[in-house]
Regions:
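H/E-rich (His + Asp/Glu) clusters that bind or coordinate divalent metals
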Residues: 162-181, 193, 197-313
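Short, glycine/charged-enriched secondary-structure capping and boundary segments
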Residues: 11-13, 60-62, 101-102, 128-130, ...
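Mid-to-C-terminal alpha-helical segments outside catalytic/metal-binding sites
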Residues: 2-44, 71-79, 100-104, 112, ...
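Acidic-and-aromatic substrate-binding clefts and catalytic sites of carbohydrate-active enzymes
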Residues: 23-28, 54-55, 92-98, 121-128, ...
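Active-site gating/metal-coordination segments in enzymes
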Residues: 49-179, 183
Length: 313
């Protein structure tokens, strides 16, 4: 679930981002969060910032924003520690500042993990300039949740009436994942627990095609060939969005059921739509009852062992 603390609202207003990525920023506060969780029967939620990221081009301002958002996130979690956790926001592409912020959030604020956008000013996940941060997260076995954002390059006068989440987000997620595969991110940093949004976007559709090209193409001037199937199997996936009808079945051909999680995408997806999406997953014939239990509860408890203690504290 996403959250919009006051400092983030202020940032959007200061930057004139009244309709970021084609959608107006939704209303959110702690009371709304608890009401939404009750209506959706969610007992524990990880809060994260959605797109856009906090990088403004001003290094000091970006570091300050990330710190204020994270401290406000920790404060919000402290009001309901048995029901809420949060993912750290990092001031990328400032790598050293992001390492410092990740350490502070994970060690002092007790964040459950970090949230990373697919790109930061054109620096995509998988870029070797991020290696020092990846090494830090790998050493901690950090839960790291990917989130799409505006592509680094937008084609003018094309699909202008279509909000970015409808199409470009899926392209962004797929592009970032393939860049990570091509640059060995999953192999070099195997302990990072990556969560890919929206059932992997276009990955299941393109996996066979990319795999066939990988057999012919060498990457990074070496004999190494990317193994997209292995990398897909390594990652975890949330079921946010309209994923049941086609994506679920396709993803399960490549990914073990233990790597799937429920995700709501509130408040950017309204409660009515979230209820419908959750019901579709609950009623689907594509999953057994045991698989549904894993999707909604069991897999999260396995990935976050401390979660069981918090819920029953």
């Amino acid at each position: 679930m996403h959250y919009l603390p006051k400092v983030y609202y202020d940032f959007l207003e200061e930057e004139g981002l009244y309709c970021p990525d084609g959608f107006p920023a939704p209303e959110w506060d702690e009371a709304w969060q608890q009401e939404a969780m009750t209506e959706l029967c969610i007992s524990y939620a990880l809060l994260s910032i959605s797109s856009p990221s906090v990088f403004t081009g001003n290094k000091f301002r970006s570091r300050e924003l990330a710190r204020k958002i994270n401290e406000e996130g920790a404060q919000i979690v402290s009001h309901a520690p048995g029901n809420l956790g949060f993912l750290a926001t990092l001031p990328l592409p400032l790598v050293h500042s992001s390492i410092f912020e990740a350490r502070y959030c994970l060690d002092e604020l007790h964040a459950d993990g970090v949230g990373l956008m697919t790109n930061y000013g054109g620096v995509y996940l998988g870029d070797r300039r991020l290696d020092e941060l990846m090494a830090e997260l790998d050493g901690r076995g950090a839960l790291t949740v990917m989130h799409p954002t505006q592509p680094a390059v937008m084609v003018p006068d094309v699909n202008e009436e279509i909000p970015l989440p409808a199409f470009e987000y899926f392209v962004e997620t797929t592009r970032a994942f393939l860049n990570m595969a091509q640059n060995d991110t999953f192999t070099l940093y195997p302990n990072i627990r990556w969560v890919v949004p929206h059932m992997g976007a276009f990955l299941s559709i393109l996996a066979d095609r990319f795999e066939s090209f990988a057999l012919m193409l060498r990457f990074a001037d070496s004999d190494r060939r990317a193994d997209i199937m292995e990398d897909m199997a390594h990652a975890y996936y949330d079921a946010a969005g309209f994923s049941e009808q086609k994506q679920l079945e396709m993803l399960l051909r490549n990914v073990d059921e233990s790597h799937l999680f429920y995700g709501s995408d509130t408040p950017y997806t309204d409660i009515t739509a979230c209820v419908g999406q959750a019901e579709a997953l609950e009623q689907t014939a594509k999953l057994t009852d045991a698989q549904k239990q894993k999707l909604f509860t069991g897999n999260a408890l396995a990935l976050l062992p401390k979660l069981k203690e918090r819920i029953h504290a």
